[in-house]
A protein has these predicted regions:
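Residues within helix-turn-helix
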Residues: 18-21, 30, 37, 133, ...
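Short helix-boundary/capping micro-motifs
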Residues: 10-28
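Central regulatory/effector-binding core of bacterial HTH transcription factors
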Residues: 90-153, 230-231
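Hydrophobic hinge/microswitch elements
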Residues: 128-132, 137-140, 146-147, 207-264
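A late-sequence structural motif
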Residues: 105, 263-305
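Secondary-structure junction motif
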Residues: 178-179, 183-221, 285-289, 293, ...
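Beta-alpha-beta core module
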Residues: 153-159, 163, 191, 235-282
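A short LG(V/I)-centered, amphipathic sequence patch enriched
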Residues: 40-59
Length: 305
């Protein structure tokens, strides 16, 4: 079995669908299905259970998957080390960032990095911070920019900055009746969350970082707000809020300024997340990875939040 074939098995397991994995790998679905069947025949065990909803790993598949990921990680690290010996900087970086934050920060970092390191490819993995932490722990990414709740921060990775969690709404929203300025509060308009719990809210999934922060804020106050629309992504929630559908949570680093939109701090003490770059604990950080990390840090340092 070749290393690329290990990647096929990993892709099928992650996508839980042969058709989706085939799209990801740029293979014909029939070819990938034949590959999987052949591997299973060679090994003498079933790696996947076929169901009406896709494929799921068996116990044997879980064991195979764990070892396949380790082998791919080791191969990738050895290649990076060999590349770093005396060759020009090149290779491939697997970088993770949330789609929401990535749409604002990644293009700037990538533009800067490509100017300085045109022979290095960056493979982008867009997921929420919670999922990216798991991918890093499994050694499946080289680097990820993630957010940690303040109560979860334990000096994990390289701290970059605090990013404020804000509320976003259209200026025609009834939340405007509760907006305060000054009074010992933040340097921007702010509201007490306890006073607006009866208004319409939009929330992203609790499994995502911003969704989990919002739910914790409400839970701590014993509030059960009315959710007018549940979405899977923070970007969709914010977009709906800007159009006046309800109130949503967003990050200061992801503000889209508009005369019709207001961004509000949450309470006098505000709410923050810690942004950090994280890496596999035992991973090798190549020159290319370090250079890309530097590009991200320079972009963040140039931004005014």
């Amino acid at each position: 079995m070749e290393l690329k074939e290990l990647e096929y098995i990993v892709a099928v397991a992650e996508e839980q669908s042969i058709s989706k994995a085939a799209d990801r790998l740029y293979l014909a679905q029939s070819s990938l299905s034949q590959y999987v069947s052949r591997y299973e025949a060679e090994l003498g065990v079933k790696l996947f259970r076929r169901t009406s909803g896709g494929v799921r790993t068996t116990a044997a598949g879980d064991l195979f998957l764990k070892n396949a990921r380790q082998m791919l990680l080791q191969y990738h690290q050895v290649r990076q080390q060999l590349t770093d010996l005396d060759a020009p900087m090149e290779g491939q970086i697997h970088f993770g960032i949330s789609t929401f934050r990535g749409s604002y920060l990644f293009p700037k970092a990538m533009h800067l990095f490509r100017q300085e390191s045109p022979t290095v490819d960056v493979v982008l993995h867009e997921h929420d911070s919670i999922y990216l932490q798991r991918k890093i722990a499994a050694g499946e990414l080289d680097l990820a920019l993630v957010a940690f709740r303040e109560d979860q921060w334990e000096n994990q990775g390289k701290f970059l900055m605090k990013d404020e969690v804000l509320l976003v709404a259209n200026r025609d929203s009834p939340v405007m009746e509760y907006v305060r300025e000054g009074g010992g509060g933040p340097d921007r308009p702010w509201v007490e969350l306890s006073e607006i719990g009866h208004l319409d809210f939009l929330l992203s999934s609790r499994s995502a970082m911003l969704g989990s922060i919002a739910q914790k804020q409400f839970d701590d106050l014993g509030i059960h707000p009315k959710f007018v629309c549940g979405t899977q992504t923070a970007s969709m929630s914010a977009a709906l809020a800007r159009r006046g559908v309800g109130i949503s949570f967003t990050y200061r680093s992801c503000i889209e300024e508009s005369r019709d939109v207001i961004y509000l701090s949450i309470g006098k003490s505000r709410c923050y997340v810690n942004l950090a770059l994280i890496y596999p604990q035992e991973g090798y950080r190549s020159r290319a990875i370090r250079a890309f990390e530097n590009a991200i840090c320079r972009v963040l340092a140039s931004e005014v939040f």
